Amino acid sequence: MVEQTWVIHWEGPFTLEEGKKKKVKRSGYVLYQLSGQHHLYGANVLLYIGQTSKGIKTRLGQHDTWIAEEYDEMEVRLGSIAKFSSWRSFEKTTKPFRNPGRRIVEKIEKLLIFACQTAYNVANKNDVKDAEEIRIFNTGHCGPIFPEISSWYFLDQ
């Protein structure tokens, strides 16, 4: 199999309320990350990565219970995904990108969670087998996330 290279363009940070107002269906935002204060790891820590397939307002609303218990206000970043061919073509591409499809979003989410070992993600931390041969470039307002993530590095292929 040949490595697939993808780019995630992150926008934000937004407050939780600003994030809930974003239009996911038409915008192409397929991922989100939550960052904030963690009692052990400190400030501006990547706490959670997830998909927006149910809509960002619905998805973030599902986190309201534990977010209400956090020390400080959370920040939300929204990501759109596109196939990467070159930096020249990337610069000319309109952002946010169109949704690349559920299957690739799932693979990329799994690799992101595994590589970043986010504090609050439980699912997908060890379920990364089908995310092989993927490289991700994180661009835009990435926040506390690696600029490049490769299954070759993190999965020791």
What feature does the model see in each segment?
Residues 1-47, 51-157:
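Boundary/linker segments flanking structured domains
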